[in-house]
C-alpha cells in the first residue's frame, strides 16, 4: 500500500519543476481535504448545513459549507508558508498571504463544488489548480499571477467526497487517484495513470434547461438519444449536478460533461479558472479533451478572475462530436 505522500516523493523525478515546495503544497491540500471530509461526514450533526445568508461575487447564495471549506483550505495553505496567495470562487479578490512573498506558487480553488447537494447527501468535491507565479519572487503577488492560461498549470486535481473520499491529481505526468482511509488517516494509491475508456456512452447535462441551449447542443443531445448500434447509441444520460462527481464518473466509465451557454449566461456558467482549467488539464492527461465548443480550454487567455465559459469535457470523440454540431448548427 502506497500513500499519497510516498507517491509524490517517488514521482518527483518525472516532473521538471519538482521542488520540495510543490510537495509540501500538495500535502497542505491533502490536509485541507481531510478536515473537509471529517466535517462533511457529520454535517447533519452540527450547524454547517444550509445557506449562510451571504452571496459570493457572482451573486450566488453561499452555503455554510462553502465558507467553511474555503476557510479551512486557506488556513492549511497559509500555515505552510509555501503559497504566495490564492484565488477562490468564494473570495471577491485574490488573497495575498503576507510574509509569503518568497513563495513560488499560487493556488486557485473551488473549495466545495456542488455544495447545494450536501443537504440531500449527494457527492460534492473540491477543485484546485496550481501555477508558478509570474511576478518576481520576493514581491507580493498580483492578479497577473492568477490570470494565466490553463496550459501554464503545474498541477491540478480534485477531491470527491462520496461513498469514499478520493483525491485525484496530475502534475502533467498522468492522472493518479488516492482513496482516503479514515482509520489510518492517509490517502492510499488506488489507481495510477488513469485513462478515459476508449469509447464513452454517457452524457451529463441538465436537460431541464434544454429549451435555453444553443442549436448545436440541442442537436447533439438528440444525436445522443438516437438509436445506432454502430456507435453504441443511444447513450445513457447521467447528471448529478456536481462537476467533480459527474467528471469522476465519466473518467471511470467513459462519457462527456456538458455545460453550455444559455440566454441568461451567454458566456457559460462555470468558472474558467477554478473549474474549467483544472478539469481540462486532468482530462487531457487522461486521454480526453476539453473545449468551450470552439476552442481548447487550456489555450484561453483569461481576462478576469471570475470569468465564465461554456464547458464540454470527456472522451475525445464525444467532445469532437459536440464541436462538430456547434459548427454545423449555429444560432441564427
From Swiss-Prot:
Pathway: Carbohydrate biosynthesis; gluconeogenesis. NCBIfam families: PRK09293.1-1, PRK09293.1-3. Substrate binds at residues 113-116, 206, 239, 257-259, 269. Coiled coil: none annotated. Homotetramer. The lineage of its organism: Bacteria, Pseudomonadati, Pseudomonadota, Gammaproteobacteria, Enterobacterales. Mg(2+) 2 binds at residues 110, 113, 275. It holds the Pfam family FBPase_C. The keyword Phosphoprotein does not apply. It is found in: Cytoplasm. GO terms for biological process: fructose 1,6-bisphosphate metabolic process; fructose 6-phosphate metabolic process; fructose metabolic process; gluconeogenesis. Its EC number is 3.1.3.11. One of its GO terms (molecular function) is magnesium ion binding. Its main location: cytoplasm. Keywords: Carbohydrate metabolism, Cytoplasm, Hydrolase, Magnesium, Metal-binding. The gene is fbp. One of its GO terms (cellular component) is cytosol. It comes from the Bacteria. Mg(2+) 1 binds at residues 89, 110, 112. The keyword Oxidoreductase does not apply. It catalyses: beta-D-fructose 1,6-bisphosphate + H2O = beta-D-fructose 6-phosphate + phosphate. Binds 2 magnesium ions per subunit. This is Fructose-1,6-bisphosphatase class 1. Its cofactor is Mg(2+).
Amino acid at each position: 500500500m502506497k500513500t499519497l505522500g510516498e507517491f509524490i516523493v517517488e514521482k518527483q523525478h518525472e516532473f521538471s519543476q519538482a521542488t520540495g515546495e510543490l510537495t509540501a503544497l500538495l500535502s497542505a491540500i491533502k490536509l485541507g481535504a481531510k478536515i473537509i471530509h471529517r466535517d462533511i461526514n457529520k454535517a447533519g450533526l452540527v450547524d454547517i448545513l444550509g445557506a449562510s445568508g451571504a452571496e459570493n461575487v457572482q451573486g450566488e447564495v453561499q452555503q455554510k459549507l462553502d465558507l467553511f471549506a474555503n476557510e479551512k483550505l486557506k488556513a492549511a495553505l497559509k500555515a505552510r508558508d509555501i503559497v504566495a496567495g490564492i484565488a477562490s470562487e468564494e473570495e471577491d479578490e485574490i488573497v495575498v498571504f503576507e510574509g509569503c512573498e518568497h513563495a513560488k506558487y499560487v493556488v486557485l480553488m473551488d473549495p466545495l463544488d456542488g455544495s447545494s447537494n450536501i443537504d440531500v447527501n449527494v457527492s460534492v468535491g473540491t477543485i484546485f489548480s496550481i501555477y508558478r507565479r509570474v511576478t518576481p519572487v520576493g514581491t507580493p503577488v498580483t492578479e497577473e499571477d492568477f490570470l494565466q492560461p490553463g496550459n501554464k498549470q503545474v498541477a491540478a486535481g480534485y477531491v470527491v467526497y462520496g461513498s469514499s473520499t478520493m483525491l485525484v491529481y496530475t502534475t502533467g505526468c498522468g492522472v493518479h487517484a488516492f482513496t482516503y482511509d479514515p482509520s489510518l488517516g492517509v490517502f492510499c494509491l488506488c489507481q495510477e495513470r488513469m485513462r478515459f475508456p476508449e469509447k464513452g456512452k454517457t452524457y451529463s447535462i441538465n436537460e431541464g434547461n434544454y429549451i435555453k441551449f444553443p442549436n448545436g447542443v440541442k442537436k447533439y443531445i438528440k444525436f445522443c438519444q438516437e438509436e445506432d448500434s454502430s456507435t453504441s447509441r443511444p447513450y445513457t444520460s447521467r447528471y448529478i449536478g456536481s462537476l467533480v462527481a459527474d467528471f469522476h464518473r465519466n473518467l471511470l466509465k467513459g462519457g462527456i460533461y456538458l455545460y453550455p451557454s444559455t440566454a441568461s449566461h451567454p458566456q457559460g456558467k462555470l468558472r474558467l479558472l477554478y473549474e474549467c482549467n483544472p478539469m481540462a488539464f486532468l482530462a487531457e492527461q487522461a486521454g480526453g479533451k476539453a473545449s468551450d465548443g470552439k476552442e481548447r480550454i487550456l489555450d484561453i487567455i483569461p481576462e478576469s478572475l471570475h470569468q465564465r465559459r461554456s464547458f464540454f469535457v470527456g472522451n475525445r470523440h464525444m467532445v469532437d462530436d459536440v464541436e462538430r454540431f456547434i459548427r454545423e448548427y449555429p444560432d441564427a
